Amino acid sequence: MKYIDEAIIHVIAGKGGDGVAAFRREKYIPKGGPSGGDGGRGGSIYAMADRNINTLVDYRFARIHRAKNGENGQGSDRYGKSAHDIVLRMPVGTVITNEATGERVADLVQHDQKILLAKGGTGGLGNLHFKSSTNRTPRQFTLGEPGEEADLKLELKVLADVGLLGMPNAGKSTLIRAISAARPKVADYPFTTMHPALGVVRVDQNRSFVMADIPGLIEGAAEGAGLGHRFLKHLARTRLLLHVVDIAPLDEAIDPVYEAKAILEELRKYDEALYRKPRWLVLNKVDLLPENEREKICKKFIRSLRWKDKNFAISAMTGDGCKELTYAIMEFLERESMDENQERATFAEPDTSD
């Protein structure tokens, strides 16, 4: 299935049914009172998060979603039938924005989360509501109200704890295959990964985290070059970024330090908030370096890059260093969660001082 992470849809809620002016016409009651019923409610349109859906492809090709109108009221006090609501199922992680105003309508972050997109119109009133002591035969009734209508932008941002970024062929897909059950395509040519891949990394029976792999970045990505710029938004929700670098490129003309700096610059130009996220350096393919020179080459690279944060030397192909990396990630995420919980508890603690 083609991966689609953006779509624009037009939603039209149903109009409320009209009320009606009618009178009782029964044998032996020549002047019956008003009996016009109300119109039914128009159908509303909802969005619901569904963890079994992972693309917005259905909404790229079916753009208009219209709920039915409520039925009109009838005589003999019969109310019009309300229309059924429509529920649009979308992937967890979908952000919904009003195209006209730019206002965020919803952020679907939990399975079965349900949000109203367009409210159906209220049904009109029949003439039985207008009877009074001075007006026994009212002919007034009201029309049903129109339903809400809007153009909405749908944007999927995957929910992951950890995001991988790096140049094409840095070994990101091999890494996520090595430590999770995800099976992205792996090959010896650039841009093998064409869309985000998610993998659940299980550290032990009770602990796990979700990792996201996106297409590799190239220089100029922030201005639209390559594929990765389209998918950088999928790293927005992550709590930790892993900058994966091919420390042993087969092409001697490639400078890993230059490429690593280029990635950091693209990240900074794309989104300052994303650039400021916690970020670790992962030097991949150390198995291709001479064993007696690995440590020296890695240290030289870190000095040249002026890297101050955490770094790991691994081989995603052989698994060397991967276990240590996954445990370090899990510990970091657990500390982050504890700190967040403490902050919330401190914020919520009532002030008992006089």
From Swiss-Prot:
GO terms for biological process: ribosome biogenesis. The keyword Hydrolase applies. GTP binds at residues 166-173, 191-195, 213-216, 284-287, 315-317. GO terms for molecular function: GTP binding; GTPase activity; magnesium ion binding. SUPFAM superfamilies: Obg GTP-binding protein N-terminal domain (SSF82051), P-loop containing nucleoside triphosphate hydrolases (SSF52540). Pfam families: GTP1_OBG, MMR_HSR1. This is GTPase Obg. It comes from Nitrosospira multiformis (strain ATCC 25196 / NCIMB 11849 / C 71). The lineage of its organism: Bacteria, Pseudomonadati, Pseudomonadota, Betaproteobacteria, Nitrosomonadales.
